[in-house]
Curated annotation (Swiss-Prot):
Its EC number is 2.6.1.9. It comes from Aliivibrio fischeri (strain ATCC 700601 / ES114). Keywords: Amino-acid biosynthesis, Aminotransferase, Histidine biosynthesis, Pyridoxal phosphate, Transferase. It catalyses: L-histidinol phosphate + 2-oxoglutarate = 3-(imidazol-4-yl)-2-oxopropyl phosphate + L-glutamate. It comes from the Bacteria. This is Histidinol-phosphate aminotransferase. The gene is hisC. The keyword Transmembrane does not apply. It is an enzyme of class 2 (transferase). Pfam families: Aminotran_1_2. Its cofactor is pyridoxal 5'-phosphate. The modification N6-(pyridoxal phosphate)lysine is found at residue 209.
């Protein structure tokens, strides 16, 4: 059966999500999920009908939250579908390319490679910022540039002046996609205000992180209306199931937003607790994180990751040497993880 697959698919290495990697334990801090399991109400009376392509109540609710016009919002099956739509809509297979800056989220390359679009990489600088001269030198045939901020897995914010420089150099050349999956934890760092000046800017958002709805698979693309209309040409006819739209709209209600903001304060306190406890350990470096996770460098990251795994504490190994990414859980999970790591290192 493998030989019947397209050559690009045969050569493809699938993205190994936290769930695919697996593990067994009672502390799961490997997928940047929220520890809060919130309850929602759902009306089962409409399940015999297809959903609307872009449910107005959901679009209007997210537009109000993001402070944009409803015409500037597209909803999809997670931000991952937004990535795929952008590549499919703007890149010609076997002709165009995307560009991204590792270490960063792995689905940019997967989405491109799946449909035969070349991937170009320009690594981040030593302080995990954009290498603008190298990006500019690599823009030939590039139609989409992906930038993640806060970046996954490093946790840092990309300098705003560099984003502006990137937007200027890509005018009339490429779409710039800001992946803001974790921006709810630092909304003041969003680039949404730049949409008014840059028609080639697209912004990815999700309800998976701060809104504690990873299992719902509901994401958004923010852009100017002309770009959104291009994406609407290639999106599936019923991308957002009725239950997803209804629950997401509840999460974006006044009560839902108040709960989300309260829970983010709790997570911020737990992140500070975890960071402070790790920083005092010998040989440990904790990088500043703006999302719901921390990137931590150990004397031997692989051994810490494996020992925690064997102990039922599931963390996320990193492609960065000796680094482990730790999601911020509830206080009990953070205490258990910190205590285990302390015992390993002292």
């Amino acid at each position: 059966m493998e030989k019947l697959a397209r050559k690009q698919v045969q050569a493809l290495t699938p993205y190994l999500s936290a769930r695919r990697i697996g593990g067994s334990g009672d502390v799961w801090l490997n997928a940047n999920e929220s520890p809060f399991d919130n309850e929602y109400q759902f009306n089962f009376a409409r399940l015999n009908r297809y959903s609307e392509c872009q449910p107005p109540e959901l679009i209007n609710a997210y537009a109000a939250y993001a402070k944009v016009k409803p015409e500037q919002v597209l909803t999809s099956r997670g931000a991952d579908e937004g990535i795929e739509l952008l590549v499919r809509a703007f890149c010609e297979p076997n002709q165009d390319a995307i560009l991204y800056c590792p270490p960063t989220y792995g689905m940019y390359s997967i989405s491109a490679e799946t449909i035969g679009v070349e991937t170009k990489t320009v690594p981040l600088t030593s302080n995990w910022q954009l290498d603008l001269p190298a990006i500019e030198a690599s823009l030939e045939n590039v139609k989409v540039v992906f930038v993640c901020s806060p970046n996954n897995p490093t946790g840092n914010i990309v300098d705003r002046k560099d984003i502006l420089s990137l937007l200027e150099m890509t005018k009339d050349r490429a779409i710039v996609v800001m992946d803001e999956a974790y921006i709810d934890f630092c909304m003041e760092k969003s680039t949404v205000d730049l949409l008014v000046d840059y028609p080639h800017l697209a912004i990815l958002r999700t309800l998976s992180k701060a809104f504690a709805l990873a299992g719902l698979r509901c994401g958004f693309t923010l852009a100017n209306e002309e770009l959104i209309n291009v994406l609407l040409k290639v999106i599936a006819p019923y991308p957002v199931p009725v239950p997803v739209a209804e629950i997401a709209t509840q999460a974006l209600s006044e009560a839902g937003l108040a709960r989300m903001k309260y829970q983010m304060l709790d997570l911020s306190a737990n992140r500070a607790y975890l960071q402070a406890g790790l920083m005092v350990l010998p040989g440990v470096t904790v990088f500043e994180g703006w999302g719901n996770y921390l990137l931590v460098k150990f004397p031997d990251g692989d051994s810490v990751f494996k020992a925690a795994w064997d102990h039922g504490i599931i963390l996320r190994n990193s492609p960065i040497e000796n680094c482990v990414r730790i999601s911020v859980g509830n206080r009990e999970e953070c205490e258990k993880t910190l205590g285990f790591i302390r015992n390993q290192l002292i």
